[in-house]
Amino acid sequence: MLRSMLVVLALLASAPAFAQVQPFPPGFATREIAVNDVTIHVRTGGRGPAVVLLHGYGETGDMWAPLAADLARDHTVIVPDLRGLGLSSKPKGGFDKKTQAGDVLGVMDALKVDTADLVTHDIGNMVGFAVAAQHPERVRRFVLIDAPVPGVGPWEEILKNPLLWHFRFGGPDMERLVAGRERIYLDRFWNEFSADPKRFTEASRQHYAALYALPGAMHSGFSQFAAFDQDAIDNRAMLAARGKLAMPVLALGGEKSFGPMMAAVMRAGASNVTEGVVPESGHWIMEENPAATLKLVRGFLESGR
């Protein structure tokens, strides 16, 4: 652990743009929470009903700073880095989303949070779905943003999209191929999945590229995708055994990305789905149109109070 922290500090010191990403408000604290076989890096702030924000691939919990700053006015905001990503520890396995749901629930338990709203993006959607499907009593409202969930709806058709070739890209040789070229690899995601790549700023690119260059981080990223087949099996089994999610769900798609299809897909896995579209945005909603995203998320959360 000490060696890993020294590596992190060295990277921070050598990357001048690292601090240019919007910071969390001064009232937020960070802590490391030991859960299962990992240590999860968590940011917390605010006071009120709890809301958990889960990031996806190509980013970390840092993506949520603008939303967290607003929600902290009347919520307790909890922002973890997923296992293996950001400043969380880097295990060799456990990247199926049922296991990662256990990480999230463990964080909630450590913070003495019984129930929470979930706001999730990309792979965070998949972890959040596993939380909500296994423990619906702990999720009040659920916002999923711009990524499908394995095994839910037309998953096999979605996999045929040529833009999603990275779902099958991984393994030791692929890790060697990308090692030292993390920025080049990640630029492909930030460019191809943006409505306007310029909105994913150079500061953000340097920030996340440095985090994904940490030892074990790219292995963790590839492992998130490698687990999709098992995730699909698990999700189909949970839906067959327990039925669709019953809590209110907001399915948001970027206008230039999933758009209204996000809600159409999620209706296969949830019975109370509200459709939402983030205008003038591709996949990276917090970089491309944070104001509209914030308005849609806050409006949905407030409708349940």
Residue locations for each model-derived region?
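Conserved HGGG/HGGXW glycine-rich cap/lid loop of the alpha/beta-hydrolase fold
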Residues: V38, T44-L87
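Catalytic histidine-centered segment of alpha/beta-hydrolase-like enzymes
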Residues: S281-P290, L294
